[in-house]
Amino acid sequence: MNSKLRNSLLDTALALAASAVIILMGATIAAADDAKKYEAEFTADGKLVRPSGWREWVFVGSPLTPNSLNGGEAAFPEFHSVYIDPESWEHYKKTGEFREGTMFAKELTLVGDTAGTSGIGFFNGDLQGFEIAHKDTNRYSKETDGWAYYSFGHKPEPYDDAAAAMPTAACAACHTAAAAEDMVFTQYYPILEAAKAAGDDGAGIGGKK
């Protein structure tokens, strides 16, 4: 092999190796950025900053206790559409535990029409509020098992940009008394129960592509 060809092959190999390193570094940085994207942020006075993009998180359910089935005085008469941040979803699938930093987003919608083309029932109306449940055992009290709950307004959009943690009696006490697992009402969310430590099977991955 002449030196010119050898040098050309060496240059090509070095270029490919450099490209591989750049790609690997890029993937590592992207993964770190994705993880950071789902970290809670706080203002200087300790309020939780409303996360962005929650409607693209993993949807886990939408319970409803309408006024019409509760004597006109339901404690929570709206639809509660609940999402978990994607990083915590992946962790829960693998371990069956809610990681430090887990966030659940809950968006409220009023009950709208009670009749549709599919029949009589309950259909979503207007948006009516937004809340976050956040797990951080270093930040929050042992009394709430390291969780805190935030309301960004019981109102239509725009929601508040930041919120202070609600008093324990306002939300956490009910979770302490009745939630099935780690302050989370998993008993009402079959998607979470199916995902618990189930890997990709718990996400419905598999079967026909």
How should each PLM-predicted stretch be described?
Residues 69-71:
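Acidic, aliphatic-rich amphipathic alpha-helical segments
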Residues 1-10:
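N-terminal secretory signal peptides that target proteins for export/translocation
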Residues 21-23, 48, 165:
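Short N-terminal micro-motifs specific to bacterial/archaeal maturation
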Residues 12-26:
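Bacterial N-terminal signal peptides
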Residues 33-35, 40-43, 50-58, 62, ...:
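Sequence context surrounding c-type heme c attachment/ligation sites in exported
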